[in-house]
């Protein structure tokens, strides 16, 4: 069941001289942007501020996911700092350009529902007392949602706007096994169902370009998350990070890594298959320079974003136009 405890805004379409596209007066994209969603929900600019509470991951005992470097991509948070200090540091950066913006603390690093619930609750309570904080975002794994945690998330969702982000990466169970993900796609589907029973906004993380996956596999992942009824999605491009099992595999095998052109083509086709009411919260990866082995084109994030926009205009396509 889709959540109904917030004012969900559907994108509208309009006819233009060049064809059909989304009516999005903020940034004129052809897909449902997070910026637009936040603007419609809260009436002004909203930023997510990364928070690191040193959460670990239960899958680490089994070696962890093969691509994991135990770093958050492009995170401005520092797990050695007090959470209020982390939040203020992130907020100051945004305030320089957008002084009137609102904020959602984002528990980004690690598996946060694998942490002590009372510790997390204490952090959340402190953050919700701060001015301009309008919600909480918690990242976790679909296999780390106990009934105790679900009860707490249900309670939290009744207090504020809550986002729960779940890593899926691929709907192909053979791929999930190869990357040592530690769960199958049914676990993800069940987690989404349990969160939606509590009217919680659910975001899926997927990765394009996982070793030996075909374009069909990546499109099937989109069809799978559509069927799960997710509310938002983050689409990442696989990158090889230093000091990871994936780096060792890449050094020996040199498996194919998507070119920028291949990635853009796949993302455009994925967006066409994605329900129009799903918010696109991320559409490319954002690795740090010091850990990146390949692909080097991923460093230029805004070039990739602009090229996706250009390709959608060129092909006269938009999110969900094949549904």
Regions found by a protein language model. Name each.
Residues 20-104:
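N-terminal [4Fe-4S]-dependent radical SAM core
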Residues 22-36, 40-47, 232, 240-323:
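Auxiliary Fe-S-binding modules of radical SAM enzymes
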Residues 47-51, 103-105, 136-138, 162-166, ...:
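Hydrophobic faces of well-ordered beta-strands that scaffold small-molecule active sites
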Residues 71-90, 94-117, 132-145, 161-188, ...:
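Core AdoMet radical
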Residues 95, 124-131, 153-161, 193, ...:
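Acidic (Asp/Glu)-rich catalytic clusters
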Residues 117-125, 146-157, 218:
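Distinct, well-ordered alpha-helical segments
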Residues 186-245, 261-284:
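Conserved C-terminal portion of the radical SAM core fold
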């Amino acid at each position: 069941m889709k959540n109904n405890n917030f004012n969900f805004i559907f994108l509208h379409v309009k006819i233009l001289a060049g064809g059909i596209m989304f009516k999005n007066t903020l940034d004129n994209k052809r897909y449902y942007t997070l910026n637009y969603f936040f603007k419609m929900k809260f009436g002004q600019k909203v930023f997510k501020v990364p928070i690191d509470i040193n959460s670990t991951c239960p899958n680490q005992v089994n070696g962890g996911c093969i691509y994991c470097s135990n770093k958050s991509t492009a995170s401005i948070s520092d797990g050695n700092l007090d959470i209020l200090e982390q939040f203020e540091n992130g907020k100051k950066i945004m305030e320089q350009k957008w002084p009137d913006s609102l904020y959602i603390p984002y528990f980004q690093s690690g598996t946060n529902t694998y942490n002590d619930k009372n510790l997390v609750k204490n952090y959340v309570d402190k953050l919700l007392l701060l001015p301009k904080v309008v919600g909480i975002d918690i990242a976790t794994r679909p296999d780390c949602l106990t009934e105790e945690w679900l009860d707490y998330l249900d309670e939290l969702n009744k207090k504020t706007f809550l986002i729960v982000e779940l890593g899926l990466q691929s709907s192909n169970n053979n791929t999930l096994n190869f990357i040592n993900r530690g769960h199958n796609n049914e676990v993800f589907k069940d987690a989404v169902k349990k969160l939606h029973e509590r009217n919680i906004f659910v975001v899926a993380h997927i990765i394009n370009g996982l070793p030996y996956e075909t374009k069909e596999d990546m499109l099937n992942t989109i069809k799978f998350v559509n069927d799960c009824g997710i509310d938002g999605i983050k689409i990442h491009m696989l990158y090889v990070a230093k000091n990871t099992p994936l780096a060792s595999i890449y050094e020996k095998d040199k498996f194919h890594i998507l070119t920028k052109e291949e990635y853009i083509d796949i993302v455009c086709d994925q967006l066409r298959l994605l329900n129009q009411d799903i918010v696109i919260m991320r559409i490319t990866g954002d690795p740090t320079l010091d850990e990146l082995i390949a692909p080097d084109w991923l460093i230029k994030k805004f070039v990739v974003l602009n090229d996706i926009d250009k390709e959608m205009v060129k092909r006269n396509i938009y999110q969900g136009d094949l549904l």
